[in-house]
Amino acid sequence: MYEFIKPNYKDNNIVNLMSSISNSFWKKHEYNTLKSLGSEELDSFENIVLIVVDWLGYNYLKRQENSFLLKNLDSKLTSTFLSTTPCANTVFQTGYPPQQHGLTGWTANIKEVGGITRILPFTSISGEETLSNTGFNINKIMDIDSLHNGFNWKCFTIIEEKKSKRDFIKYVAKETKIIAAKTYKDIFIELKELIKSKSKERRFIHAYMDEFDSIQHFNGVNCDKTNLLFKDIDREIQALAESAKGTNTKLIVVSDHGMIDHTKESQLWLKDIPGLEECLTIPITGEPRVVDCFVRPRKVKDFKKIMETTMSKYCWYFPWEQLINDNFYGLGEVNKKLFDRVGDYVLIMKDNYVLRDTLEAYVWEVIPQKAAHWACSDDEMLVPLVIIDCN
C-alpha cells in the first residue's frame, strides 16, 4: 500500500528494544519485546549499557568494512515515524513511540503554550529563550512517565553538558542520575569509570551522543569528516568493550535514525510553491521531510489540487486519520495530545526532497544542510542493533 518503509512496532522496532530492557528491570511494558533480543537474554547481566549514536544508520554501518561495530552487528531495527530525534530518541527515555509520548517533530503546534514550539530546547519558533522562563512548565506538554520510573535498580543518563541542562532532559531523565560530559570522548571516559565501579545493584546506563548527527547535516553522509568521526567512535566503543571485560556487562549500540544526502536543488521553499501558503492556517510544522499542514476548511480543495499537481513529484500526502489508523505513530491507546499536533494533512517527501519554511529554517539560507533524515526511506528508517557481551 505504501511505497516506503513503515515502522514495525510489533517486534522489530527501537520501542521493542526498550520493552525488552524494561521487562528485564521488572517494569511491565505495553509493547512486545524485541524479536532478536528478549528480556531473558538481558536478565543475567549486572550492567545493561545502551549507547545511542544519533544518526548511525544501518545502511551506513553496512558500508564500514572491518569496523568493530559491523563485526558485532546483530540485526536491523526500524525507527519511529517520524525518524527524527524528538520522536525516536524520546523512545529511549520514555520507552514509547509518538502514539504515547505525543511528540511529532522538531517543531510542533503546542496548544498548551499557544503556538509553534521547538520541543527539545523548549523554545518558541521565533526565539531562543526557554519557555520555562516565561511561566510555562514542560510537564504540561509531556504527560508520559520516564522509562526509569518503576525500575527496581539504579539508572544513569550520560549526555553532553549543554543538553543535560534542558528542561526536556530533566523531565524524561528525572528518575536517573544525570552525568554531564563535555564531548563524546568524555562520555566514553564516564562509561568506563561507571562500569568498573562496584555496585550492589544492577544498573541501566543510557549514553547519548549527537556529534555524528550534527557533522552530517552540514557535511554530508559519506564525506571525509563523517567517516573520520565514525572511525573514532568505533575505536572508542571497541576500547570500552575491552575495558569492560569481566564486568558482566551487555553493551547495546543503536541509533534513533539514519540519514540521506540532499542538495540545494532538492530543497524546496514553501514561499516558492504558488498558492500553498494561502491554504494554511498556521506555518508548517514537524520536519522538512515529514510536514504537518493545518489547512483552512475553505481551502481543502485548493490544497489537494496543489498536492496532486505541483507537489506530486516531490511528496505523498495523507489525511491525519489515515496515518494514525495505520499505526504510523505506534500501537495501542493514542495520546490525546497527538490529535492537536498532527496536521490535517501530512506530507511525506519523496527521494531526497525537503520542504522548508523561512519561519522555522531561516538559518539554513545562510548555512545550507547537506544531509537530512525524518522520513521513511530505508537510509533514514533502518538503524543497526549492535550487541557486545563483556563477560
Task: Name every feature range the model reports, one short phrase each.
Residues 1-391:
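Feature captures the catalytic ectodomains and active-site-proximal regions of enzymes
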